[in-house]
Amino acid sequence: MKDAWWKEAVVYQVYPRSFMDANGDGIGDLQGVTSRLDYLQELGIDVIWLSPVYQSPNVDNGYDISDYQAIQPEFGTMADFDELLKQAHRRGIRIVMDLVVNHSSDQHPWFVESRKSKDNPYRDYYIWRKPKEDGSAPNNWGSCFGGSAWQLDPETNMYYLHLFAPQQPDLNWKNPKLRDDVYRMMTWWCDKGVDGFRMDQISAISKMDDMPDGEVAPGQQYGNYGPYCINGPHVHEYLKEMNARVLSRYDLMTVGETAGVTIEEAQKYAGEDSHELSMVFQFEHVDVAGTVSYTHLR
């Protein structure tokens, strides 16, 4: 049996903003990437991993997506993307998209609706919790970007969870309607012809229902959310569902960013018989200083 194509592929990451500027405005763009395909082909690469090009307020360099099916105007148009895809494929180069579905931008229409009222149809697309009696955050979790992982929204006087910036509310993967919309969006890109996805923070999409205070490390103000958000109880269920609904229908390369995951756990995401992802970015082996605790995952 022939190995999957991606097992022998050479992947080259392109960060569009700084790669090649075709129109002289000082910002790299999709036309710039297309103009350098011959150069990339000469390098001998097989795959371009394209960092986020979706519409975004750019709070986190495009990892805060406000429209999953639109191109950030400073990078060009959807026609520019289609031309890049066509020209890359003509040269035997595949395109893998960066995909961010642990969270969205707070300017995404889902969140704009979600925050309007407690009974809004999109309310449960995100993770909301009541304040404590004194009005403080539901627990002591800290954000990866500093400060609390909770943001009070005055519209309904409830907090929403954001493991990253306050402008990046976490999506509620427990909601099947949210998952349906994510799979529909992924299918749209696959039908367009993309060759896979690199999935940002995919090990964090399943949070535990119980959200107690996290352990506070010496010298830190906030608690560790890891035991309650990384490798949550349904993460493999969701990825198997994603595989069945979308990934298995196409010839794709899928890479999961799995920070906080042990080598043993990583094999569950990308094992031959896991029916989840092709491979993962696994970080434990580069934690030379031993500053990250993985004990809760063993």
PLM regions: where:
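Hydrophobic residues within beta-strands of alpha/beta enzymes
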Residues: I48, F197-M199
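Substrate-binding cleft/loops of secretory-pathway carbohydrate-active enzymes
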Residues: S105, S114, V255-A289
